[in-house]
């Protein structure tokens, strides 16, 4: 029977059961939560249990541990993460049963059909910028839907179905899937060399993908672009779409002036179009976060959010999971008190920005970094940049590379990176195996009053949380 579909209610009635393969991932779990709230019967499978799967289960989703062909029986649609292999038994069964299979980004695009989409793209800063934009629109009374690649701490979730007409979401350039989206507004924070393995190791293809991303805007759409980034500025100069620029550059339409860091906060004057200005205190450290806030302010101003409401949102922002999260002070067995910061940063540019923020807010402290490189291919491609930026800290402990499914690459492991750093003659890094070993090794490196940054996109975040709760182990302890 042919069914006439007019809105999301019709879709839920016609195709009520949706199954997510790899539901525990940040992007997947957010979409699943929105679809649950819309009224879909959501199920999902994952090899690991985590905060996201437990939250979804508490909201009514049916969560299966591991992958089995039986998991997809009776479902109307299967949504798949880009991390899932083609020979996954659930995908194979869905194909044999002719069940529609949708990549994660394609399902996000479907959700955007029923909202006005704001897509946040860029190599770095997407999660924080998406979160700040959602916060600004919420403070302005627009009640947006949002899907974020990290937990918005104020909401306790990475997604929410709002009652307003706008949907704010991250647009993932890593595999080119952001080209599936059709937003009305697009933000680009920066363009850097990352995930080159998905672009034939050709940065020109990355640049072309971002240009195409803007081309997907309708003629009446808006590109919100950071012109402090040279690559984005070059794109802004030639895109055939309406542009609102932001940055600290005097030429930016929305800009920050008089920028000062005060500990973990930034103070600046927000300059908006038409001569409007607003004093702002941002509840995040670092100039990179000022840029993220400017993107959110630009969108807010464009949608009619009052400048004082923008300022309230930025000052009251509670942060995002694993983005310069202050986990508090921990004492080693020898009595050294250290403050732990947990951060997702895993690219040299991200490390550099976080180090600058740490030094700007805690200039009197020794900067100790525990870093878990993420992917052998990234370590290889960014090897010299990693060596340069990691050489700048006061003390460094490296865990082995988190492979994320990759096979080891000769000369692209943590031991090779440590040798390159030693050759620069500025520091003597310590190398451990698994990130879990950091808890026993770090006390030998730390001194009283240190600021400890624990960074990486792998399982080092769980180690940081464990240390913050349980303390350091290994100084004569089991």
UniProtKB/Swiss-Prot annotation:
Pathway connected to this protein: Cell wall biogenesis; peptidoglycan biosynthesis
Compartments where located: Cytoplasm
Protein keywords: ATP-binding, Cell cycle, Cell division, Cell shape, Cell wall biogenesis/degradation, Cytoplasm, Ligase, Nucleotide-binding, Peptidoglycan synthesis
GO cellular component, one term: cytoplasm
Keyword field contains Magnesium: no
Keyword Ligase assigned: yes
Purpose of the protein: Cell wall formation.
GO molecular function, one term: ATP binding
UniProt main location, coarse: cytoplasm
Catalytic activity: UDP-N-acetyl-alpha-D-muramate + L-alanine + ATP = UDP-N-acetyl-alpha-D-muramoyl-L-alanine + ADP + phosphate + H(+)
Any single Pfam family the record assigns to this protein: Mur_ligase
Residues that hold ATP according to the record: 122-128
Protein family according to the UniProt entry: Belongs to the MurCDEF family.
UniProt name for this protein: UDP-N-acetylmuramate--L-alanine ligase
EC number in record: 6.3.2.8
Family matches, as NCBIfam families: murC
């Amino acid at each position: 029977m042919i069914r006439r579909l007019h809105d999301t209610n019709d879709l839920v009635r016609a195709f009520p059961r949706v199954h997510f393969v790899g539901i525990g991932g940040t992007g997947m779990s957010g979409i699943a939560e929105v679809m649950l709230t819309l009224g879909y019967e959501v199920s999902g499978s994952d090899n690991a249990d985590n905060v996201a799967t437990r939250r979804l289960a508490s909201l009514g989703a049916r969560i299966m541990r591991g992958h089995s062909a039986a998991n997809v029986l009776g479902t109307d649609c299967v949504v798949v993460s880009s991390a899932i292999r083609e020979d996954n038994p659930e995908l194979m069964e869905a194909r044999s049963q002719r069940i529609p299979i949708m990549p994660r980004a394609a399902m996000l695009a479907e959700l955007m059909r029923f909202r006005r989409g704001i897509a946040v793209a860029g190599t770095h800063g997407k999660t924080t910028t998406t979160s700040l934009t959602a916060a600004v629109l919420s403070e302005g009374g627009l009640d947006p839907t949002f899907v974020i690649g990290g937990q918005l701490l104020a909401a306790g979730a990475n997604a929410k179905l709002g009652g307003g007409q706008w949907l704010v979401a991250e647009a993932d350039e890593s595999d080119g899937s952001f080209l599936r989206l059709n937003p009305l507004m697009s933000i680009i924070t920066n363009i850097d060399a990352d995930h080159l393995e998905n672009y034939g190791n050709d940065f020109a293809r990355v640049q072309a993908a971002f240009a195409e991303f803007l081309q997907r805007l309708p003629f009446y759409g808006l590109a919100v672009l950071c012109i402090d980034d040279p690559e984005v500025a070059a794109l802004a100069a030639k895109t055939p779409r309406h542009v609102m620029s932001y940055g600290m550059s005097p030429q930016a339409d929305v800009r920050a002036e008089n920028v000062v860091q005060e500990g973990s906060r930034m103070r600046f004057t927000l300059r908006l179009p038409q001569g409007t200005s607003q004093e702002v205190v941002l509840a995040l450290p670092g100039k990179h976060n000022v840029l993220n806030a400017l993107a959110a302010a630009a969108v807010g101003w464009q949608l009619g959010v009052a400048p004082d409401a923008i300022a309230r949102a930025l000052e009251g922002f509670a942060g995002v999971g694993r983005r310069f999260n202050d986990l508090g002070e921990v004492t080693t067995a020898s009595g050294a008190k250290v403050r732990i910061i947990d951060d997702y940063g895993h690219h040299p540019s991200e490390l550099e920005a976080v180090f600058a923020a740490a030094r700007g807010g805690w200039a009197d402290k020794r900067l100790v970094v525990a870093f878990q490189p993420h992917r052998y291919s990234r370590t290889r491609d960014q090897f010299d940049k990693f060596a340069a930026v990691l050489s700048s800290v006061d003390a460094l402990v490296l865990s082995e590379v988190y492979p994320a499914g990759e096979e080891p690459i000769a000369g692209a492991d943590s031991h090779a990176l440590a040798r390159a750093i030693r050759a620069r003659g500025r520091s003597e890094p310590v190398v451990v195996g698994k990130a879990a070993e950091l808890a026993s090794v770090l006390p030998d490196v730390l001194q009283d009053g240190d600021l400890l940054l624990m960074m990486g996109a792998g399982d080092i975040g769980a180690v940081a949380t464990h240390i913050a709760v349980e303390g350091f182990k290994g100084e004569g302890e089991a």
